[in-house]
């Protein structure tokens, strides 16, 4: 890519993962792809990619949304960084991955990566990605520098209509469980939330969001009955419960806040499910299941109604066409039957006239026949219809 004359590129075709657990020392190193011999790759904006060299590995290497992304595929290294080592002109780092990312988070992660581009250090989107996956931030080895800890600090706003908009677009944070339960991410950000303020500290593995809300209660059902609820109904149930508690806190006075301290009720999202406080509320898992069941039934009925509304026009059109076809066939059959009846009536009339003529002729012949001729009639099989005439011509 130097001088616009020579272009070289590489592509990682496969990455094998061999991971046994978050703290198992027996995890084997996955095979690292062989580096190419060409010049180092450049980012789509023209800047050369930085060499780690034993320092903080860049986490945000994704191209901006408008740049072409057909030559390179940027893969984030959220956790499990090993010791960097040199291989030729490249500095390589072994990565251990856990397959905890559901397929439904692909678009969310891509949107987070696209919204926060650049080549900085451990920024907000990587921390939010870790929090959305339910993973704690990794503890880097001694060879790597410890990055800043990302905090989400909301402004001290008064609780009111602004607190109703509980779902925002800044960060996707969930309370993780110890089991591999695929739960939908719970958005926790205020509309007037300020950008995060990075702080350096020794604890690089903490990412939490403190959102003060009046009498807010969210239960972290790690391994209970909430894991058996569908994701859509759970999300609707949680949203409805949050709106009910935020909208009318005076009506539900029996519900205690999340924290035992009434002065600072806050909702903390941490990377460990054991640190989450579960309030002993009367509306527990049973109420959550009832709300989720009601919302799922309403959603199913709404989908059925929309399907009926969308397909009612086509069904009515098909019924009309069938009725028109049946009417056409009926009219054709009626015309054919009428024509056949007229033809049969004509034939019956002709046969009746002929029969009358034959009977008249037969009577005349019998009147004119002789007794000898009439005596021969039974032998010929012709019945005698009348008395024989005394004199008459022979037949």
UniProtKB/Swiss-Prot annotation:
SUPFAM superfamilies in the record, alphabetically?
A: Delta-sleep-inducing peptide immunoreactive peptide (SSF58026)
> Please, one GO biological process term?
glucose homeostasis
One cellular component term from this protein's GO annotations in UniProt:
cytoplasm
The annotated regions of Pro residues compositional bias extend over 28-51, 385-395
KW Transport (keyword) present? no
One short Pfam name that applies is: TSC22
The segment annotated Leucine-zipper runs over: 344-365
Q: What is the effect of changing residue 329 to M?
A: In a breast cancer sample; somatic mutation
Phosphoserine (modified residue): where?
49, 62, 165, 187, 189-190, 225, 260, 264, 279, 370
Keywords, A to Z, come to:
Cell projection, Cytoplasm, Nucleus, Phosphoprotein, Repressor, Synapse, Transcription, Transcription regulation
Q: InterPro entries per the record?
A: TSC22/Bun (IPR000580), TSC22/BUN_CS (IPR047862), TSC22D4 (IPR042553)
Q: Where is this region: Disordered?
A: 1-86, 103-237, 376-395
Q: Which residues carry this modification: Phosphothreonine?
A: 57, 211, 229
Describe its partners and assembly state.
Forms a homodimer or heterodimer. Forms a heterodimer with TSC22D1 isoforms 1 and 2. Interacts with NRBP1.
Record function comment: Binds DNA and acts as a transcriptional repressor. Involved in the regulation of systematic glucose homeostasis and insulin sensitivity, via transcriptional repression of downstream insulin signaling targets such as OBP2A/LCN13. Acts as a negative regulator of lipogenic gene expression in hepatocytes and thereby mediates the control of very low-density lipoprotein release. May play a role in neurite elongation and survival.
Q: What's the family? A: Belongs to the TSC-22/Dip/Bun family.
* Official protein name in the record: TSC22 domain family protein 4
Organism, as annotated: Homo sapiens
